[in-house]
Amino acid sequence: MLSPKDILRKDLKLVHGYPMTCAFASNWEKIEQFHSRPDDIVIATYPKSGTTWVSEIIDMILNDGDIEKCKRGFITEKVPMLEMTLPGLRTSGIEQLEKNPSPRIVKTHLPTDLLPKSFWENNCKMIYLARNAKDVSVSYYHFDLMNNLQPFPGTWEEYLEKFLTGKVAYGSWFTHVKNWWKKKEEHPILFLYYEDMKENPKEEIKKIIRFLEKNLNDEILDRIIHHTSFEVMKDNPLVNYTHLPTTVMDHSKSPFMRKGTAGDWKNYFTVAQNEKFDAIYETEMSKTALQFRTEI
């Protein structure tokens, strides 16, 4: 039986060729064998791409914008993370999902080929939120500073190198976004961009409402936009992850919800780092139609 000391600040473990958070890798057989339900709604993202934001949006849509219903529990209970396992600390994502009534919202950061086959077989609806790689790398670095489930990130310079070579949890950002983009050709996947959501939340949330086959009026839509704004969510203890023990997430090092903007990477990248990043990006993304904006 693993204890917290066995999983905190440990090296990543390979799972079918992908680097994975040590704590999550210990539970892989259960994750692979997970049974989906046909009406499950999957939220998939690469880490630090707006997952909690879109999770709360979808929960509000399913509850017709009823804020009181959305206060029924922490985001980790309402929208469990499939692969989340914290031995000796709290309920796993799978255990929580098994308790939740349908339609369940399932959060995951898994690449397409690690997602349990059951989700594909049941033709579950999926929403993928993608964010530009430069902002993701900066946000991920700060996340790994405060998240003790991850290996210590080292300096920003060291971390950026790991990010560019896919030596971070869940592997390469490039592989992740390209494979999910390709998968939408054969599966019901709504592919959204973080930057579009920041720029025009009303239009993007309308896309989610249509995809989920809901019909909500403008008053409810405006309520959802307000309740899920970064400023409101940052101060909402049900969604800002301050409910997790400080042994897991130390908000004194960096808050879970840090800035929620597009373009913050410019405060961290040197000219040389930016040039190197752009060269690698061009090579990796040359054969895809995916288009990202690094600022709004």
Curated annotation (Swiss-Prot):
Query: Can the keyword Cytoplasm be found in this entry's annotation?
Result: yes
GO biological process per UniProt = 3'-phosphoadenosine 5'-phosphosulfate metabolic process; biogenic amine metabolic process; epithelial cell differentiation; ethanol catabolic process; flavonoid metabolic process; phenol-containing compound metabolic process; sulfation; thyroid hormone metabolic process
Q: Where in the cell is it found?
A: Cytoplasm
- Active-site residues, Swiss-Prot/TrEMBL: H109 (proton acceptor)
Catalytic activity field: a phenol + 3'-phosphoadenylyl sulfate = an aryl sulfate + adenosine 3',5'-bisphosphate + H(+); 3,3',5-triiodo-L-thyronine + 3'-phosphoadenylyl sulfate = 3,3',5-triiodo-L-thyronine sulfate + adenosine 3',5'-bisphosphate + H(+); 3,3',5'-triiodo-L-thyronine + 3'-phosphoadenylyl sulfate = 3,3',5'-triiodo-L-thyronine sulfate + adenosine 3',5'-bisphosphate + H(+); 3,3'-diiodo-L-thyronine + 3'-phosphoadenylyl sulfate = 3,3'-diiodo-L-thyronine sulfate + adenosine 3',5'-bisphosphate + H(+)
Q: Which residues of the sequence carry a binding annotation for 3'-phosphoadenylyl sulfate?
A: 48-53, 131, 139, 194, 228-233, 258-260
Any idea what this protein is called?
Sulfotransferase 1B1
Q: What class of enzyme is it?
A: transferase
Q: In the record, what terms sit under GO molecular function?
A: aryl sulfotransferase activity; sulfotransferase activity
Tissue specificity remark: Highly expressed in the liver, peripheral blood leukocytes, colon (mucosal lining), small intestine (jejunum) and spleen. A lesser expression was observed in the lung, placenta and thymus.
Binding-site residues, substrate? K107, T108, H109
Q: Which GO terms describe its cellular component?
A: cytoplasm; cytosol
- The record's principal subcellular location, in a coarse class, is cytoplasm
Keyword terms, alphabetized = Cytoplasm, Transferase
| Taxonomic classification | Eukaryota, Metazoa, Chordata, Craniata, Vertebrata
Which species is this UniProt entry from? Homo sapiens
What Pfam families is this protein classified in?
A: Sulfotransfer_1
Instruction: Name the family.
Output: Belongs to the sulfotransferase 1 family.
**Cleavable signal peptide:** none
The UniProt function text for this chain reads: Sulfotransferase that utilizes 3'-phospho-5'-adenylyl sulfate (PAPS) as sulfonate donor to catalyze the sulfate conjugation of dopamine, small phenols such as 1-naphthol and p-nitrophenol and thyroid hormones, including 3,3'-diiodothyronine, triidothyronine (T3) and reverse triiodothyronine (rT3). May play a role in gut microbiota-host metabolic interaction. O-sulfonates 4-ethylphenol (4-EP), a dietary tyrosine-derived metabolite produced by gut bacteria.
EC code? 2.8.2.1
